[in-house]
A protein has these predicted regions:
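A structural signal for well-ordered alpha-helices, especially hydrophobic packing surfaces
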Residues: 20, 48, 103, 137-144
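Charged, amphipathic alpha-helical coiled-coil/dimerization segments
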Residues: 71-130
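N-terminal helix-turn-helix DNA-binding core of bacterial DNA-binding proteins
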Residues: 23-65, 70, 76
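N-terminal leader segment of winged-helix/HTH proteins
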Residues: 1-35
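Terminal interaction helix/tail motif
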Residues: 5, 108-153
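Short, flexible helix-adjacent loops and helix caps
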Residues: 21-29, 78, 83-84, 115-118, ...
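A specific heptad-register position in long alpha-helical coiled-coils used by two-component signaling proteins
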Residues: 14-17, 71, 100, 134, ...
Length: 153
């Protein structure tokens, strides 16, 4: 990859994280959670049988950090953990009613954010944007698959 392309990709990453407004300290989506905490809670919401190990693998984040966040959520009454039979040391993470409500608030906030930022675009432009995002996701997923294949050999 040439230097110009690398700089452009990094510039876009900085632009997009700023556009999403995820770097602000403090609450995210009208919750008392930081962006990483909100993301972890939302992943539990959309993957109801996930374990801490599954979260770490899916989000590619540190086990210690996930453990601290899950302990905080448990203390705050947002989740419970249930031992998975036959899986040594694994516990399924289960949202409480309060955890589901918080996740739904995050979900609604995400919808509102996208509507506020992109609602003025016409359908053709939104379609182009979605196709561009699909292309990026597919390209990066293919790279991951290739890397995994190389590592298995």
């Amino acid at each position: 990859m040439n230097d110009c392309a690398m700089k452009e990709i990094r510039r876009f990453n900085r632009y997009y994280t700023a556009w999403l407004d995820v770097m602000n300290e403090g609450s995210y989506m009208d919750t008392d959670l930081s962006w990483p905490e909100a993301r972890i809670l939302f992943e539990i919401y959309i993957c109801p049988d996930i374990t801490a190990t599954g979260l770490c693998e899916h989000l590619r984040i540190d086990k210690g950090y996930v453990s601290r966040v899950l302990s905080k959520f448990e203390k705050d009454g947002l989740l419970t953990r249930q031992t998975v039979s036959g899986a040594k040391g694994q516990k399924r993470i289960i949202l409480t009613n309060a955890g589901r409500e918080e996740s739904e608030r995050i979900d609604r906030g995400g919808d509102r954010q996208i509507e506020d930022k992109l609602g003025c675009l016409d359908e053709d432009t939104v379609g182009q944007l979605c196709r561009a995002m699909e292309f990026i996701e597919e390209t990066l997923s293919n790279l991951e698959s290739e890397e995994e294949s190389k590592n298995e050999r």
